[in-house]
Design a protein with these regions (language model features):
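Exposed, low-structure sequence patches enriched in small/polar residues
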Residues: 1-303
Length: 303
């Protein structure tokens, strides 16, 4: 048993540190409407809950401490076939919704207590069997209270969301996305300790196609066939950051572009070529602007 007392042979030995940790976790999944509506979209409703608890006791050089971590509830609700519920099945398909809520507590006995609440969800659907759409949103709030000073030493809030669309255009797969996040935090005196806002639009392209060709060998009736498979991918992204703190360093625009190509000429010969370009601009201090570019290539022979 792991908690069997240590029995040192040295009579002068003393225990210097000790850590005891007890952890419990329970995971459950429930489909409350499946038995009542087996062939209905309501029957796809599922509820998942995770429960976890951890109690830790420490002793170091005669100083003892205890801490408790508790996550309850940690709920996830999901449902599919939403187009049948809203009657939008003529132009919408594969609609699914996931929503979540969690509460996490951490207690350091006689020291402080922290609470973090998180809620959010994501929605996915396809329009006209062409446009693959994804929407998501998350929000979290956190507080920390000190039992000694009886002050709230931490208050913060974070919000984030994204919207993405993907579709096929001829031989290309096009993916567009827009990410947004902002956070704000305050210390025990009510001063702003954290402030950040980031917007990130991006677009990506990927193509996979073949350009078959052949070469007739001289003095022979045989023909050497080349696969000529080409995979091209490229992306462009902007990270625009804004903040009221450390204004000279936190108000920036960061552009990133890359282009990669993979060429499979035959079964035994493949080549790849890549390029990248980064442009960094500081909207306050112009002398900190810079750019970076790179090129790489690789040829692979297989025998």
């Amino acid at each position: 048993w792991v908690r069997t007392p240590l029995l040192p042979t040295n009579l002068g030995a003393r225990r210097t540190n000790l850590t005891l940790r007890d952890a419990q976790s329970i995971n459950t999944r429930w489909s409350p409407l499946l038995g009542y509506f087996p062939n209905s979209p309501w029957g796809t409703l599922s509820i998942t809950n995770n429960y976890s608890k951890s109690l830790e006791r420490r002793e170091a050089t005669g100083t003892t401490s205890r801490s408790l971590s508790l996550t309850m509830p940690d709920l996830i609700l999901s449902m599919n076939q939403l187009e049948r519920i809203f009657g939008t099945y003529r132009w919408m398909s594969s609609a699914s919704l996931n929503s979540k809520y969690s509460l996490r507590k951490r207690l350091n006995y006689e020291v402080d207590e922290s609470r973090d609440i998180n809620l959010g969800g994501d929605l996915h659907f396809v329009i006209k069997q062409v446009y693959d759409m994804t929407l998501s949103y998350d929000e979290s709030k956190g507080t920390t209270k000190n039992f000694v000073t009886r002050l709230t030493t931490r208050q913060d809030k974070r919000q984030s969301g994204s919207a993405g669309m993907g579709f096929n255009w001829r031989i290309w797969r096009v993916n567009t996305k827009f990410d947004f996040s902002q956070s704000r935090g305050y210390d025990a005196l009510g001063r702003i300790s954290q402030d950040s806002k980031v917007m990130s639009p991006s677009i990506g392209l990927r193509g996979d196609f073949n350009l078959p060709a052949g070469l007739r060998l001289p003095f022979s009736g045989k023909r050497l066939t080349f696969t000529n498979r080409v995979i091209l991918s490229s992306s462009l992204k902007l990270d625009r950051q804004s903040s009221q703190l450390n204004v000279e360093q936190t108000n920036t625009d960061n552009w990133n572009w890359n282009l990669n190509g993979d060429f499979q000429i035959g079964q035994n010969l493949r080549a790849s070529l890549g390029s990248s370009f980064q442009l960094f601009k500081n909207r306050v201090l112009k002398d900190q602007d810079y750019y970076i570019y790179g090129l790489n290539t690789q040829v692979i022979f297989q025998f």
